[in-house]
């Protein structure tokens, strides 16, 4: 009886962790909108480029994330994704302190400075993180729920935080 209780407690902790990861996915994905407003003041065309870069990463990371789960497992893939996300956020932070006075190329609306390129690179890397986390969370919640209706219910509960 004691083993069953420990197993259920571990399952509850895993479910709560997966729901927390759903909330992190939402945070990182939606972080581009307020930053985009700031970039929109300097470059009228760049307001949604951060979100675009975030979702463009799915194109490049979807299949490798699935392969990573097959080779490394759910836990290691989630931890790698969190490390990648931290690197992406640090790169985005660097865009606020470096490159504002270094023009990279010119458009008809003016010079595009290095800090925008750094920010977009950070958003792209954060998109890798979000893609890997999505690849982990959805099947993991279904697995924790035992598949079928119960697994889908857990995905819906986690999705409310997304």
Feature map (PLM): residue ranges:
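Intracellular juxtamembrane helix-capping segments at the cytosolic ends
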Residues: 132-146
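Glycine-rich segments within core transmembrane alpha-helices of 12-TM secondary carriers
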Residues: 150-162
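Central cavity-lining transmembrane alpha-helices of secondary-active solute carriers
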Residues: 48-69
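Extracytoplasmic
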Residues: 13-41, 134-138
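Cytosolic juxtamembrane N-terminal segment immediately preceding the first transmembrane helix
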Residues: 1-25, 103-110
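C-terminal ends and interior cores of transmembrane alpha-helices
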Residues: 26, 83-112
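Small-residue-rich packing faces within the transmembrane alpha-helices of Major Facilitator Superfamily
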Residues: 59, 79, 86-87
């Amino acid at each position: 009886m004691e083993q069953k209780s420990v197993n259920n407690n571990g399952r509850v902790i895993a479910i709560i962790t997966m729901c927390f990861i759903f909330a992190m996915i939402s945070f990182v994905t939606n972080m581009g909108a307020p930053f985009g407003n700031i970039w929109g003041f300097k470059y009228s065309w760049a307001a949604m480029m951060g979100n675009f870069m975030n979702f463009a990463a799915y194109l490049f990371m979807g299949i490798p994330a699935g392969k990573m789960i097959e080779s490394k497992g759910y836990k290691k893939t989630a931890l790698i994704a969190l490390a990648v996300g931290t690197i992406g956020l640090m790169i985005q932070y660097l865009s606020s302190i470096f490159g504002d006075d270094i023009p990279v190329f010119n458009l008809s609306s003016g010079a595009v400075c290095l800090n925008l390129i750094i920010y977009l690179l950070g958003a792209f890397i954060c998109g890798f993180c979000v893609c890997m986390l999505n690849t982990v969370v959805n099947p993991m919640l279904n697995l924790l729920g035992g598949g079928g209706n119960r697994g889908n219910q857990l995905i819906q509960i986690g999705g409310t935080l997304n």
